[in-house]
Amino acid sequence: MATTKLGFIVQRTPYKSENTKLALTHAISSQSVEVYLNDGDLVTADIAFVGDGVLNCLKNQKAMEKYGLTSTESHIKNCLLLDLNVMVCKEDLDKFGLSENDIVMDAEEFGADMTVKVVPFSEITKMMEDVNHLLFF
């Protein structure tokens, strides 16, 4: 029984490129590989938003209206629905003058039990040290 831990670090602003959506899509799809794993093997995914990447977590995004795209907000909620660990760097939120009230914190309307965790960068660093594969977007 082995667990492969994946870490996704999102550090770029939303909608300027596909990086953020790729990170979230890969994290979500990592949960569907169980059909290819041996019994008892697992793949887990942690996602951390740091630097400019915390702007991806803003509430009430109007991506469909402005760009004709699904919002990053809905992708984050899908991650929570799949019980993925989603973290946002507290120091970077503070840098932008944002708080938990400004960002997506849950996906209750989807039936998700998980919530976004606002954490110090030291906790994100620990996650980066603990994963088997670390991907930057």
Which residues fall in each region the model found?
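Histidine-anchored nucleotide/phosphate-binding helix
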Residues: 19-40, 47
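Short hydrophobic/aromatic patches at helix-to-coil boundaries
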Residues: 15, 134-137
